[in-house]
A protein has these predicted regions:
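Generic multipass alpha-helical transmembrane bundles of integral membrane proteins
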Residues: 100, 130-224, 229
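Membrane-water interface at the C-terminal end of transmembrane alpha helices
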Residues: 110-119, 143, 172-173, 227-229, ...
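N-terminal signal-anchor module of multipass membrane proteins
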Residues: 1-49
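Juxtamembrane helix-loop boundaries in multi-pass membrane proteins
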Residues: 1-20, 56-83, 98, 114-142, ...
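Structural signature of hydrophobic alpha-helical transmembrane segments
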Residues: 33-46, 91-106, 150-165, 211-222, ...
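Helix-coil boundary and interhelical linker segments in multi-pass alpha-helical membrane proteins
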Residues: 23-32, 84-95, 142-154, 201-212, ...
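C-terminal functional regions that serve as terminal interaction/effector modules
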Residues: 26, 45-47, 220-227, 246-308
Length: 308
């Protein structure tokens, strides 16, 4: 049970990334990958619930720490994605899971804002992992567009606004304030919010503003380029739970490119759409390696396998 108490918070966002990637593979026809990942994530979620109940004091301590606290939002994101899976077998239960997860996430946003913005502020803990809290709620728009949940459009507009509010301040912070090694990999999270905005907007909003879509996808491309340039430095570190910062952003980036390719095709820009589709293929190739690497290393940590 000690291993359960020590289960790192970043396992949660790692599985959000793995679940998202499994949906990509399912779209390619590899449905078993999706089923296996969904069941594995369900086990991890149950284990984390046990940790919350049995080791409440440990979890409260983690929640008081700004960076882990921002990542706790991934708990709700896992529930949302699992809800979309359950929805296929039981629409009422699946939809309820998504709605409950959104409510929990909204409460988390309020708590996080009070503790880390209103009550006190620390530029050293102001990192891209904050986007997991503030934009992670948009996962509901990624997976729930066909569930008939009326409030999703409000989440889309909230997510886009909060992204444009935070990202310039975040860029300033990354340029002007030293990033500590312990949180270095959270820089990769900058790809997640803009990708979520693209996917959510194209999924939920009927009358789309093409200029807004292009601007958001330009942010995706810039963020992706930033991560690709940083990859050698990211992997220069010995593995630690912070590597989870690379997982979901890269996975949702694939979905954003696929959605953008569809949008461009509908706009009559087949040539550019084909290029974006090929980019999505490259993203899938790189992301599979990254998520596989992180998952394998978490297994090694969990089983206490001695490294040679």
């Amino acid at each position: 049970m000690e291993r359960l108490e020590r289960m790192p918070v970043p396992v949660l966002p790692t599985f959000v990334g793995a679940l998202t990637l499994s949906n990509v593979y399912s779209g390619l026809g590899y449905t078993w990958v999706r089923h296996m990942t969904m069941w594995a994530a369900a086990v991890i979620l149950l284990l984390y619930i046990v940790k919350l109940v049995k080791y409440t004091k440990t979890c409260v301590g983690e929640y008081k720490n700004t960076i882990p606290c921002s990542l706790y939002a991934a708990f709700n994101m896992v529930i949302m994605i699992l809800g979309s899976y359950v929805y296929e077998f039981s629409p009422a239960v699946g939809k309820m899971m998504v709605v409950v997860a959104v409510a929990l996430h909204a409460y988390h946003i309020l708590m996080f804002t009070y503790r880390n913005v209103i009550k006190e502020r620390n530029v050293n803990t102001f990192m891209p992992s904050w986007f997991v809290t503030y934009n992670g709620i948009m996962v509901s728009c990624v997976i729930g567009a066909g569930m008939g949940i009326g409030f999703l459009k409000y989440i889309v507009y909230y997510g886009i606004i909060i992204y444009f509010v935070i990202i310039p301040i975040m860029i300033w912070r990354l340029l002007k304030v030293e990033v500590k090694p312990a949180v270095y990999h959270t820089m990769a999270v900058v790809l997640a919010p803009c990708s979520l905005c693209v996917v959510s907007y194209l999924n939920v909003i009927e009358n789309k503003n093409a200029i807004l879509v292009y601007v958001l996808y330009a942010c995706v491309l810039a963020s992706l380029a930033f991560i690709i340039i940083k990859l050698p430095k990211f992997f220069a570190f010995q593995f630690n739970p912070g590597f989870a910062g690379l997982t979901f952003p890269m996975a949702i980036g694939i979905v954003a490119s696929n959605k953008m390719a569809g949008f461009l095709t509908a706009q009559g820009k087949e040539g550019i759409a084909a290029m974006v589709t090929q980019l999505a293929g490259i993203q899938t190739y790189i992301t599979t390696f990254i998520i596989g690497y992180v998952l394998i290393n978490f297994v090694i940590m969990a089983l206490k396998i001695e490294r040679k």
